[in-house]
């Protein structure tokens, strides 16, 4: 860490029990709300190392390649274990992606956090651990097989169930809101927007 500033961020962890944290100007202060960035990012990155350790096999670091673990699970697990669901960190971006039908472009942090919350609520948080403890006949961690064994459903079915749930939630929430024309009359300004090319 090259600065004592604790309100700017980024970092990543790798399966070799290393984490890298660097600083850069960005919007961390907006989504952190009451938390300090350094505390948040250290906990998040250390959670990745815990995940890598839990899913490690005789293939060591190469096991990550063969596990088939989706990014949403890796990032969602770190979010689930170290953060709380809050407006600027997850909810606003999540809602926007759902209402625009763009869940396939969702950041794996938000996507995964939501899916891990759903997984824990539906199956119990012990299924998260059971998924990571699974090893196939070659003694390798296989996410899809471990997920199916722990939950009883495929990852594909889980994703579809999750999609239905979040769509139902956000569209139900939206349907309770007034539209702008119910609030009052809409007026247009007497000029048109034009772009000036220099």
Q: Where on the chain are the PLM-derived regions?
A:
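Active-site-proximal alpha-helical
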Residues: 72-89, 95-153
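Alpha-helical scaffolds flanking conserved acidic
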Residues: 36-38, 68-77
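Short, structured interface segments
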Residues: 154-174
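A short helix->beta-strand "capping" segment at the edge of beta-propeller domains
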Residues: 174-193
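Juxtacatalytic substrate-recognition/specificity segment
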Residues: 1-62
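Beta-rich catalytic cores
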Residues: 37, 193-194
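Conserved small/polar residues in nucleotide/adenosyl-binding loops
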Residues: 196-198
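Flexible glycine/proline-enriched surface loops and loop-helix/loop-strand junctions
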Residues: 33, 59-64, 99-101, 112-114
